[in-house]
Amino acid sequence: MSRPTVSLIVLAAGQGTRMNSDLPKVLHRVGAAPMLHHALRAGQSLEPERVVVVAGHGAEQVARAARAFDETVEVVVQAEQLGTAHAVAQAAPLLADAPGEVVVLYGDTPFIRPETLERMIEMRARHAVVVLGFEAADPGRYGRLVTRGEDLDRIVEWKDATDEERAITLCNSGVICAETHLLFSLVSEVGNANAAGEYYLTDVVALARAKGLSAGVAICDEAETLGVNTRAQLAAAEAEFQRRARAAALEDGVTLTAPDTVFFALDTFLGRDAIVGPNVVFGPGVTVESGAEIRAFCHLEGCHISRGATVGPFARLRPGAELAEDVHVGNFVEIKNAVLDEGVKVGHLTYLGDAHVGEHTNIGAGTVTCNYDGVNKHRTEIGAHAFIGSDTMLVAPVSVGARAMTASGSVITEDVPAEALAVGRARQVTKPGLATRLMEMFRAARDASKKGTN
């Protein structure tokens, strides 16, 4: 059976007053990515034809973040935050003629699973409106879902519920799915005759039932519905994201020697049989291929690590770092916007930025590519099978040819031809006996100084 055409609406207009922040709530990060990206990524699993983000507070920032995730995302602005139904209505001019289904998600609810959304779409074959519910450990003031089997009879707000209805633990998440034309028709009928004077999306269930249409409930784990309204909830969301990411990595065949100390980003990819040591942090945009090893206390972002490579301990890989197979990057090494070909070894205490290093080249301890002149960045090219001596300063732009060598302590300011040895340091001068005479002179000066102060 073919998948129906789907559109996606993500509500992202809330100010998030309780976050006590100038940043729009949906742009606070979980797993090194805005919460909005989590919602968009979950919705992506439905292969939506169109995606509309409803922005409000900080609309320009929200729009930039949405389009950074997917440049085809459309953004509309809810100038006044008058409730969730009012927010959905802002998408009507864009989607009113869209075929198929529409799913409404929330930009501050980052943990809805793709399989949950798939289940909602499947249930749409049996119900005009499908609501996502969850069994709450502490139902508190959540809206209650009054059901008969999977059929939803009504949604009752806590303040309006009887004691019997308050005993219900099946609660409303707010996520909803319906045929596109029907949803916008129902939304247009929602009123605001309530204490808050807002237009609530949940009212579409009662409106649908009044028309003789069926409503259903898809049930998910409570953790999927975790919303973020405070900094404490943001911290809880981060903890839940990391718990899930660690469990998924282990399930996928990755070795985590101390799982609770490894931190993932939303888009971290680790291949099977990769090994990750303790206290490793993955920022955005990291791919680690099968069989690679990341040792303790490394920080990685925007980099690609190929099969058999080893990184760390105490290494930092920054955006643009590309490590080919069997590369070794050791302790206290920083790589930025640099490509290291197969078998390159960078043992320790080195900075390689804006560089390309050919295969099987050895980079000695203390090597620095001096890539910045105070205004512009410049590139360093190092050929294959070269040997860069310890404490070499490579003042870019500069190149070192294949199988060339640089002497330890050299400052290389000119290109080094293939197979040449470059020495760029002052000649050593040795003065026999001078060390002893100097120490005697220094001690005499010190003693004279002490007598002068008495």
UniProtKB/Swiss-Prot annotation:
Binds 1 Mg(2+) ion per subunit. Its EC number is 2.7.7.23, 2.3.1.157. InterPro entries: Bifunctional_GlmU, GlmU-like, GlmU_C_LbH, Hexapep_transf_CS, MobA-like_NTP_Trfase, Nucleotide-diphossugar_trans, Trimer_LpxA-like_sf. The active site is at H348 (proton acceptor). Residues 1-231 are annotated as: Pyrophosphorylase. GO terms for cellular component: cytoplasm; membrane. It comes from the Bacteria. Pathway: Nucleotide-sugar biosynthesis; UDP-N-acetyl-alpha-D-glucosamine biosynthesis; N-acetyl-alpha-D-glucosamine 1-phosphate from alpha-D-glucosamine 6-phosphate (route II): step 2/2; Nucleotide-sugar biosynthesis; UDP-N-acetyl-alpha-D-glucosamine biosynthesis; UDP-N-acetyl-alpha-D-glucosamine from N-acetyl-alpha-D-glucosamine 1-phosphate: step 1/1; Bacterial outer membrane biogenesis; LPS lipid A biosynthesis. It is an enzyme of class 2 (transferase). Residues 232-252 are annotated as: Linker. One of its GO terms (biological process) is UDP-N-acetylglucosamine biosynthetic process. One of its GO terms (molecular function) is magnesium ion binding. Its cofactor is Mg(2+). It catalyses: alpha-D-glucosamine 1-phosphate + acetyl-CoA = N-acetyl-alpha-D-glucosamine 1-phosphate + CoA + H(+); N-acetyl-alpha-D-glucosamine 1-phosphate + UTP + H(+) = UDP-N-acetyl-alpha-D-glucosamine + diphosphate. In the N-terminal section; belongs to the N-acetylglucosamine-1-phosphate uridyltransferase family. In the C-terminal section; belongs to the transferase hexapeptide repeat family. Catalyzes the last two sequential reactions in the de novo biosynthetic pathway for UDP-N-acetylglucosamine (UDP-GlcNAc). The C-terminal domain catalyzes the transfer of acetyl group from acetyl coenzyme A to glucosamine-1-phosphate (GlcN-1-P) to produce N-acetylglucosamine-1-phosphate (GlcNAc-1-P), which is converted into UDP-GlcNAc by the transfer of uridine 5-monophosphate (from uridine 5-triphosphate), a reaction catalyzed by the N-terminal domain. Homotrimer. This is Bifunctional protein GlmU.
